[in-house]
Amino acid sequence: MVTFCKNAGIFLHAIFFLLNQSGAGGAQDNSYNYYYMQIGQDNFIESNTTRCYAKNDQVFGCFDLNYPWTSDHRPVSLFPEDLDKIEPQYILQTRGSSPVVVELSNFNLELTSLNPKKPIYLVTHGYMEGGGIAWINNIARTLLLQEDCNVIIIDWSRGSGPPYTQAVANIRLVGAITAHLLHRISNYTGSLKLDHAHAIGHSLGAHLCGYIGYTLQQKFNITIGRITGLDPAEPHFSKVKPPVRLDRSAAKYVDIIHTDSSQFIRGGLGIVESIGHVDYYPNGGTDQPGCTKGVFQYIKDANGSFFNGVKKYLSCNHIRSHEYFLESITPNPKCKFVTVSCPSFQDFTSGKCFGCGKSRENCLPFGFNGRKYYEKHLGNKWRHTSRIQYLITGEFKPFCKHHYRIVVQVSSSNMSKIHGGEIGQLYFTMHGTTDGRGHKTNPVGFVSGFHEPGGLYMAVVATDSVPHLRAVELEWRYNSSLFNPLTWRILATPRIYLKKITVEALENEESITVCPKWQKPLANGVPQLMIPSYCQYF
């Protein structure tokens, strides 16, 4: 049933994408014709491969469709629509002032509440969204609570609608226009230039931020301080070269959060490639916890609405990127949001990359607070390549969890050998006291499968934190199958004999080794509290 739901969702995903291409073919044919266009108050004549966009005597940019904008990996490439149609709005928010629309044509710093010497954040949306969407307002509000800053919301909703290929083209123009606004602001920032500017974009908005950065560099010789890409869109951007897509060269620091990076044909909306100075892959960057329900369950949760249910099903992984980022803005003393560098997520979850190293060079804070640590400890070494970081999150808010590496050694005693191996799963609860009456975590599942006598099993799990790791509670859950006689236990009680368990806490840098009391086996469904002093019986 789960497989069917997933396949049905992928099929619908493909259908929706194809429907969004309606009209793209005709636009593509026309885009190679000879143009005479009126944009704003100015007239321009374009060649068959270039269009220029201007208003009130200000040219925002001239765009062509030559390589790399059209390539084997991007066979369809369009011009942006008319400026008068897609003209973006810029909504400025500062502490103590009501949101106001910033007019680019007659920008006057004295008529706004913008303080050019304070941090400047730009936040923008993706395909089929607008600047008034809840997640953008949540990020803006949280940034303003966290520090005295300027937040500029880029609303390009007039150009973000279908077909998708046209929205892809429109962000080139929106990025160029936004770069001109930032250039005007930079006239008031002095030596800071735009080092204190940070552009944050989701999906198509992430690549839009890249176009802001490239335009600032090419036209004004200014490099923006930071760009954060929240699951940058994959369709039309995968396997293409900069400046077609966002890249670490677009800003002094580029960090990417990948949450839906499966290939598009498999249902993924986000780009797979590592394209930033730091690329975070929560939960491996694909299937996010809490997003595993079938499409029909989402329709049911949406009160039977097919459209809303399918939309939530298709976008759950994709929107996790801005949900994680929002949570990372406000430091939580109870959860540090630590990430670990590792060659692959499989290596990370199997425990091969656990630990931060002597100088903590393997770890980075996740999301918003990662830049300072990166530049202090890693900047020179990793400046020209991508730093790949992994973490495991929870299913629900708060998403931040602490990581534990667990090593389980199954007993090789005679009793264990006589009983033989068992098929099932161990569940761990970390305790802050040896009597089990104090602070404890929620249970978390360990390796599921066959556990043989003398076997050694290691994995990384994530759950809540405890102030001090003092004891571990284990529960064995036996897996039986009606169709597999080897799992039947008719004359014997399902149980497993353990020798010892070692648990290491990444964030708190604690380690504990516990054992079952008097070598007592773990019976199916019966929790057992284990503490270090019980290891004296072995």
Locate predicted features.
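Histidine/cysteine- and/or acidic
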Residues: 171-280, 292-293
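Flexible, membrane-associating and regulatory peripheral segments of lipid-active enzymes
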Residues: 2-153, 159-170, 180-194, 220-222, ...
